[in-house]
């Protein structure tokens, strides 16, 4: 009886210890990308300073004019918006197999190809599919935030590059960061910096991997520190359907207007309703134009040609 009692006590202590470790590991998981957490706690990866050379597709994004966009908001409001934005974007990245590297202020860094990969081509395609889905979701969030009283929408720039990088644990034995470094990472950041708000700019190395799923236009070549070649960026102008035809996505957000149209997502039964809504909106704008003219707005032929 005494032995059974001791065994029962030991089992309870063991269960309590396991529960404690499970809670701790669950908390730690929020500080790591899911793929990194899984590889460490499954024993597939050691927690040592070690890097590998791999071909990755790297994604950078930031919010254009974030400071001026949020200057009228309180810090608590900015925190809520950013956390919701990062939560939504991170979920999309995870669904497409991306590893969320880090958050830098309002910027987001993601890479494809480590620790899990489907091959260079599929990794690049997954990254572009992720980026376009992020654009769609951000358009929905901007509508939601505007209705909640946020005057200025988030206008996001995105840059994507594919190339060889060093990826793994960097830092010291006391504090490590699992990340990717190299000139190709810097190029992705540079492409993001030249993108117009609402657009995705990709390198030629990425373009050749995804040109069957996106329509893109070449921009003037640029030079990037650390890369001994001129780089030709491409701006993504839309996605392609199975027949290779470009599908345009329309998005515009400003005071008095929240407009987003993805023809692929429209149900056939809703097409006529959408057409009627657009016709009514145009008629309302034309009526507003007449009101402005009657109120003294100058006609085009009366305007100063120097303006």
Residues of each region from the PLM?
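Conserved, well-folded catalytic cores of nucleic-acid-processing
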Residues: 31, 43, 118, 134-137, ...
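Catalytic NTP-binding/metal-coordinating core of nucleotidyl cyclase/transferase enzymes
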Residues: 15, 21-25, 29, 46-129, ...
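Short amphipathic alpha-helical segments
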Residues: 37, 41, 83-87, 188, ...
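Catalytic/regulatory signature loops of cyclic-dinucleotide turnover enzymes
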Residues: 161-162, 170, 183-204
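Regulatory cytosolic signal-relay segments
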Residues: 1-53, 298, 302
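Catalytic core of nucleotidyl cyclases, primarily class III adenylyl/guanylyl cyclases
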Residues: 92, 96-126, 140-183, 208-213, ...
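Histidine- and acidic-residue-rich, metal-dependent catalytic cores
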Residues: 134, 159, 272
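Intrinsically disordered, glycine/charged-rich C-terminal tails and inter-domain linkers
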Residues: 155, 197-307
């Amino acid at each position: 009886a005494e032995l059974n009692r001791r065994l029962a006590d030991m089992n309870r202590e063991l269960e309590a210890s396991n529960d404690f470790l499970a809670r701790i590991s669950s908390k730690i998981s929020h500080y790591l990308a899911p793929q990194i957490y899984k590889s460490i706690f499954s024993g597939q990866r050691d927690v040592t300073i070690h890097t590998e050379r791999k071909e990755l597709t790297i994604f950078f994004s930031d919010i254009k004019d974030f400071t001026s966009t949020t200057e009228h908001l309180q810090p608590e409001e900015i925190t809520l918006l950013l956390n919701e934005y990062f939560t939504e974007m991170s979920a999309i990245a995870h669904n497409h197999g991306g590893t969320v590297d880090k958050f830098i202020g309002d910027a987001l860094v993601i890479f494809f190809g480590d620790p899990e990969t489907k091959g260079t081509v599929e990794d690049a395609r997954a990254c572009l599919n992720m980026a376009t889905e992020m654009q769609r979701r951000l358009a929905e969030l901007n509508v939601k935030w505007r209705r909640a009283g946020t005057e200025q929408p988030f206008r996001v720039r995105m840059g994507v590059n594919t190339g060889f990088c060093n990826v793994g644990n960097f830092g010291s034995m006391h504090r490590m960061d699992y990340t990717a470094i190299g000139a190709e990472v810097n190029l992705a950041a540079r492409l993001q910096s030249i993108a117009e708000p609402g657009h995705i700019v990709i390198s030629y190395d990425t373009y050749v991997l995804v040109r069957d799923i996106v329509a893109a236009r070449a921009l003037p070549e640029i030079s990037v520190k650390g890369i001994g070649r001129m780089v030709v960026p491409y701006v993504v102008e839309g996605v392609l359907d199975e027949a290779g035809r470009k599908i345009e996505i329309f998005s515009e957000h400003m005071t008095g207007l929240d407009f987003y149209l993805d023809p692929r997502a429209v149900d056939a039964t809703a097409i006529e309703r959408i057409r009627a809504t657009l016709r009514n909106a145009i008629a309302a704008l034309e009526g507003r134009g007449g009101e402005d003219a009657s109120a003294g707005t100058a006609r085009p032929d009366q305007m100063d040609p120097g303006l």
